[in-house]
């Protein structure tokens, strides 16, 4: 939207007090305007309003909280639950306590059922003129809407409120809980900007909270939904990842695993700045092979991260140690992050933010997501998963990071099914399979896709013996290994000799 010729100077931007929301708004809110924060009860409107005012207090500004639905004591309880104090904040309440309703009360209080809207607003504006706050929050508009009794009168009073604040060097947040009539389109048209807070129920786990900036006149903002949480300390907003905003030119180089035969499968190593999918049935060795790359990166002095959906950190470390992969010292040194992720408690937006934080703070070179099955369970639908994963993989690839993702297929032998088709997003695919030989169930692996450069097309045996991971010679005597129903097609005597060697 273009500005009028006389408004050559851009508006001053002030922080909302919520870092993630400021990111969504490209800095914050335009000073001296009126904004609507809309959402159902319990979505975090009051908390956001308090954070907005406390940011003003921290900057030495005068601030005011107009409590239309809560008493000052209730507001102080909310602040205390987050470790805050309302000191330095003028709280103007219009809800009477029992003492204030008694004949002994020494001052007048206004109640929505007893006074007219004009009288109530006159009282508020008089207080504003005396205090001259630079930030003000109205909580909430439902009481004003009840006082108005009709939409026309209500709209006129809100317009008058807007004009008063615009001319008073004051930035105003109007909180609306939408308990009457759902979304107020008229109010949204009056406000300079609209922020919608939502809380979505799930069959299991915590509610998923998200926000959307519906409009912001004359200003850029990141469209779409952004996950957020409410914790002790306020709202924590996780802006939607847009990979196009993070384009960099990172050099390509081969990333080695520490096992020469595994590197040969990828034609000399996995390329940095690519995504590799480790695909196979449960227990086939996907997580252990991924741990090789994490350990190898840490040994080179590079940072790496593992986000585990399926195992506890204790189990992950114990299994890795049993295979000669000691990550403990690297975790203690801060080179490796091993984070257990609970999809029932963490939204995808928060998960992506955790990856971004580690990558940007530590300049990580390897990121492992173990597994995508856990991430799928955290998503409401497959379409959203593919879009989110596309942005995440693009972001990591642009930073020159090698990303490893494990995906467990259903079944162990024979035909297997994928929970979601995500292979087209991967630059390389390393497939794992079980096969039977000499009365034993063994494992095999092969690279079936690599976008950049050549790769070995052989199928090799994967062995976990002697406290280490070993990659065997190509399985030239078997056919149909990757189908899950192999057929021996080689020399029987060689097969028997290998069986004896394995027993030894």
Language model feature labels by segment:
Residues 2-11, 113, 122, 199-256, ...:
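Conserved P-loop NTPase
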Residues 18-28, 258-269:
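Pre-Walker A adenine-sensing motif
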Residues 27-93, 265-327:
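Walker A/P-loop NTP-binding active-site region of P-loop NTPases
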Residues 32, 59-62, 87-88, 169-170, ...:
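Short glycine-/polar-rich loops that comprise or flank the Walker A/P-loop
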Residues 35, 108-190, 194, 345-429, ...:
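P-loop NTPase motor core
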Residues 52, 75-80, 177, 181-185, ...:
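Short beta-alpha junctions and helix-cap segments that line functional grooves
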Residues 61-146, 302-380:
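Conserved inter-motif catalytic segment of the P-loop NTP-binding fold
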Residues 69-73, 81, 95-100, 142-144, ...:
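Conserved nucleotide-binding/hydrolysis micro-motifs of P-loop NTPases
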């Amino acid at each position: 939207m273009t500005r009028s010729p006389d408004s050559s100077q851009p508006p001053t931007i002030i922080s909302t007090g919520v870092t993630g929301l400021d990111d969504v708004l490209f800095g914050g809110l335009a000073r001296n305007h009126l904004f609507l924060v809309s959402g159902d009860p319990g979505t975090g409107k009051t908390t956001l309003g308090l954070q907005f005012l406390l940011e003003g207090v921290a900057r030495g500004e005068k601030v005011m909280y107009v409590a239309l639905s809560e008493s000052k004591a209730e507001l102080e309880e909310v602040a205390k639950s987050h470790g805050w104090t309302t000191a330095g904040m003028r709280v103007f309440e219009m809800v009477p306590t029992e003492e204030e309703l008694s004949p002994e009360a020494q001052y007048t209080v206004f109640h929505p059922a007893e006074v007219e809207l004009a009288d109530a607003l006159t009282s508020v504006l008089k207080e504003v003129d005396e205090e001259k706050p630079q930030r003000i929050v109205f909580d909430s508009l439902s009481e004003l809407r009840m006082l108005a009794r009709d939409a026309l009168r209500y709209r006129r009073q809100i317009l008058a409120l807007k004009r008063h604040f615009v001319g008073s060097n004051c930035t105003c947040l109007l909180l609306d809980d939408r308990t009457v009539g759902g979304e107020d389109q008229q109010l949204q048209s009056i406000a300079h900007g609209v922020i919608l807070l939502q809380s979505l129920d799930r069959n299991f786990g915590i509610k998923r909270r998200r926000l959307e900036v519906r409009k912001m006149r004359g200003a850029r903002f990141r469209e779409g939904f952004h996950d957020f949480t409410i914790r002790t300390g306020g709202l924590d907003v996780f802006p939607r990842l847009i990979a196009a905003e993070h384009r960099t030119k990172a050099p390509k180089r081969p990333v080695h695993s520490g096992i020469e035969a595994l590197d040969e499968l990828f034609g000399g190593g996995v390329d940095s700045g690519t995504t590799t999918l480790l695909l196979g049935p449960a227990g086939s060795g996907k997580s252990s092979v991924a741990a090789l790359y994490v350990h190898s990166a840490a040994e080179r002095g590079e940072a790496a991260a593992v986000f585990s959906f399926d195992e506890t950190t204790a189990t992950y470390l114990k299994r890795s140690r049993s295979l000669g992969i000691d990550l403990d010292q690297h975790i203690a040194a801060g080179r490796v992050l091993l984070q257990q992720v609970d999809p029932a408690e963490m939204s995808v937006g928060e998960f992506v933010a955790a990856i971004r934080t580690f990558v940007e703070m530590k300049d990580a070179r390897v990121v492992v997501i173990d597994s995508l099955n856990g991430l799928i369970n955290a998503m409401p639908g497959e379409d959203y998963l593919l879009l989110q994963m596309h942005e995440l993989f693009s972001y990591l690839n642009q930073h020159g990071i090698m990303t490893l993702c494990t995906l467990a297929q259903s079944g162990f032998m024979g035909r297997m099914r994928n929970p979601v088709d995500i292979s087209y997003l991967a630059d390389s695919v390393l497939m794992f399979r079980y096969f039977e030989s000499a009365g034993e169930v063994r494992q095999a692996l092969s690279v079936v896709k690599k976008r950049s450069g050549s790769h070995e097309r052989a199928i090799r045996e994967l062995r976990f013996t002697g406290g280490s991971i070993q990659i065997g010679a190509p399985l030239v005597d078997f056919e149909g290994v990757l189908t899950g129903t192999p057929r021996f097609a080689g020399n029987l005597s060689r097969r028997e000799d290998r069986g004896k060697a394995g027993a030894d």
